[in-house]
C-alpha cells in the first residue's frame, strides 16, 4: 500500500512518527507492505514558500491508497489559512465526507465519569465533514473599522445530509451495533432540520 504521510504542524509529526512505528510492526504480522511517501504540507512550508496545496500535491496524494495526517495549525500563521487551505481543500478534493470518531473506554483506564465502565462507553460519532461550517462560506465587510462585521455561514445540502445518514446506518449494520442517535443543535440551527 502507498501511504502519503503528512506530519503537519505542532504535535502532528510526533504523533505520525508513532503511527508509522505501529504500521511497521503490522507488516510481518499481517503479511502486508507499506510504501510511505513523505509530504511537507503544513505551516513551515507555507511560511517558506507561500504554498498551501499545489496540483502536484493533489496528484501525489490522489495516487496513494491512503493519507496519514498528523495535525495542521501553526502559531506563526493566522488561524484559518492552513485549515481552509489544506484541511478543507483535501476534504473537498477527495470527497472525504465522513468524519468517523470512535469513543471507547478501555479496560484499566480511569475515567472522570462517575460509575462508567468500558461497556458504558463504546460508541462512534459519524459527522459530515465537508459542509456545514466546513463549507468555508463567510467573510468580512468594513474590515479594520469600528463597523467591522464578520459572517460565517453553515451550508448544508440535502444530498450531503442524506449520504451521511446512510453511512451511519450502513456502519451500524456492518458493525452489529443496535442504535443510532441523531444529534443536532435544533434550538440554534432550526433550518437544518428541514431535511
Predicted regions and their residues:
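Short glycine-rich or small-residue beta-strand-to-loop segments that form or flank ligand, phosphate
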Residues: 2-11, 68-73, 180-185
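N-terminal beta-loop-helix "entrance" segment that forms/cooperates
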Residues: 33-53
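Glycine-rich phosphate/diphosphate-binding loops that line cofactor/substrate pockets in enzymes
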Residues: 165, 169-179
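Buried hydrophobic positions in well-ordered alpha/beta secondary-structure cores of metabolic enzymes
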Residues: 9-12, 65, 126, 168
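Conserved small/polar residues in nucleotide/adenosyl-binding loops
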Residues: 186-195
Amino acid at each position: 500500500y502507498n501511504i502519503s504521510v503528512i506530519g503537519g504542524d505542532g504535535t502532528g509529526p510526533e504523533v505520525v512518527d508513532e503511527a508509522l512505528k505501529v504500521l511497521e510492526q503490522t507488516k510481518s504480522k499481517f503479511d502486508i507492505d507499506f510504501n510511505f511517501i513523505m509530504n511537507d504540507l503544513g505551516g513551515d512550508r507555507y511560511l517558506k514558500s507561500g504554498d498551501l496545496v499545489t496540483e502536484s500535491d493533489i496528484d501525489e496524494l490522489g495516487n496513494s491508497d491512503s493519507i496519514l495526517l498528523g495535525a495542521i495549525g501553526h502559531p506563526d500563521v493566522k488561524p484559518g489559512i492552513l485549515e481552509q487551505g489544506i484541511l478543507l481543500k483535501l476534504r473537498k478534493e477527495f470527497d472525504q465526507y465522513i468524519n468517523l470518531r470512535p469513543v471507547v473506554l478501555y479496560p484499566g483506564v480511569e475515567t472522570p465519569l462517575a460509575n462508567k465502565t468500558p461497556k458504558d462507553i463504546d460508541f462512534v460519532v459519524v459527522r459530515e465533514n465537508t459542509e456545514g461550517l466546513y463549507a468555508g462560506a463567510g467573510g468580512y465587510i468594513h474590515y479594520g473599522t469600528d463597523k467591522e462585521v464578520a459572517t460565517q455561514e453553515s451550508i448544508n445540502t440535502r444530498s450531503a445530509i442524506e449520504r451521511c445518514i446512510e453511512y451511519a446506518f450502513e456502519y451500524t449494520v456492518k458493525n452489529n451495533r443496535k442504535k443510532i442517535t441523531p444529534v443536532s443543535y435544533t434550538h440554534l440551527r432550526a433550518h437544518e432540520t428541514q431535511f
